[in-house]
Amino acid sequence: MPRALLCLLLLLPASAAASGYADLGKLEREAVDDALALRGLQIEPEPLGRIIGAVQVVNLDVFLARERVPLVWANIFHRTTREHHVRRESLLQAGNRYDQDLVEETTRNLQDPSLSNVVAVLPVKSATPGIVDLLIVTRDVWSLRLNEDFQAQQNYLLYFTASLSENNLFGWRKYMAAVFVMDQGEMSLGPNYSDPNILGTRLKLEAAFYWLWKRDAGQFNPGPHEGTSSRFHLEYPLYSLASRWGAAVDFSHFDGVYRRFFGTDLFRIPLDGISRSICNPGPYDPAGVPWMYRLKAINTSEMVTRSFPRPSVIQRVSAGHELALLRPSFTPDFPYADGSIERSQFAQEVFPLSERISDLFLRYELFTPRYRTYRDLNTFDFREDIRLGPSLSLKAGRASTLIGSDKDLTLFQTSLDLAADWWGGLQSVGGSWEARLAGDELTDQLVRGRVTLATPVLARVFRVVAAGNVAFLYENRRNRYFVEGGDTGLRGYPVGEFVGCGAEFIGHVEVRTMALKLAFLRLGGLVFFDAGDAAANAQSLTFYDDVGFGLRLLIPQLNTYALRADWAFPLRPAPGMPAGWPGRMTFGFRQVF
């Protein structure tokens, strides 16, 4: 340990744990030590109740010499976040009384994986007796970058996105990028912009626009131009738990071609005159018609929220308006003429319900403002805050032709989740229900259940994490369906392998190691088990499962999420995948669940 750092630690009072220092992770503690040494500060052991004299901000460089990263010179090309932009995000300012709950909330608010990999807020001794100062320590991730994310299996790229971006424009915490996205059937390119503080206010803006082109299977050259998509979000957020008013406006549109895939090929269905539905479109037929159609979709919402905060529980009531427009149609190259039986059969089997729903809604939310900080759960060493206790949401809306809807109906959405941290782990269970009521008929019921379990770190070496989801559709008038496969977490099977419009389940168990530090890198491994299926009803579900192993690599200076490489082996054969060797390899970012 360097002598200067050792001397600094000796100066820290034994009660530093009461100020939060002892709860910091390794990367955070190193950053705080750097900041204390840089400013000549000491932790204040007894800050509670004192008036804050000043809010000091230290934002460290991306690359530090002590980490022996051969890129320290690159710091000259990065503009660290300006101190006053960090300072104004603090819920505690000079003249306020020190409050540990607001310190924790400020830390959570400042956490943004695209901007910082370290955020720590601590009390420090002030030069004025009886006063305490607040120290905010952050460390930027590299912002001028070519961001990438991808999913691949063997030699086929399923999904790829790249953006030439400035994630922290001029150090103002604003994001601007040109974004390219490629999935199995489409390529898109367009500008993105995000501003969390418009003109220094609390207003938040996110906007994006994309031009769409066709992608032929396995090709990297764009095909014909097919349409556009966009999204726009303007919000006055509930920026603290004590905030009482919030509002938001959203708009999105899609005008392009929707495709369904079977593995790496377009799913094809036979148009043989046999009456079927979207729940039973018939088997994959290599000589059939490709599952693709043109889709125009528009979604808008306007909402005002009133919050009723109390120390033990937060209640919120929201009211607003929503518009959802969905119009499917045939592509120009559909092989059958207007009025043909084949067209009618294809529309019946493939198209979602064409509709325009305009509704006024009321929503009630309740949750407990209690949080726990985890580490080495979904990433390595970084702080991960999870809210504990109950979380309830009740929503009802009334759609009417008087406000532009093409039908009169009532919409319901409910959800309830419970999270706990017994024995130092994480336990979360929840469920949701949504439905439509038209007259006295209840339709389109969607019931979901979910569970997440995580042990504490065992023997300082590993953690066991499990998750499961189950869902059922009843009276499915909107032609919705479930899809399970390699892109939804069933890693041993191809994309879109299992489809059903009545029931689905997916479950995972992983044994994840703690990180091994290799110079400035973090390396971890895991073994896993997946199981899942989608079918026409619960009775038709089959237990398809796989086992495998994977690696996780984290470069803290560039990302707060890990690079993922998994190799899975199916235990049960499926139409698109034999059991056992050679299995299926996938690559991407972030954990699967």
Where are the model-predicted features located?
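C-terminal transmembrane beta-barrel domains of outer membrane proteins
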Residues: 90, 390-593
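Outer-membrane beta-barrel pore domains and translocons
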Residues: 58-60, 149-153, 165-167, 179-183, ...
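Periplasmic polypeptide-binding modules associated with outer-membrane biogenesis and secretion
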Residues: 19-158, 162-166, 177-195, 215-232, ...
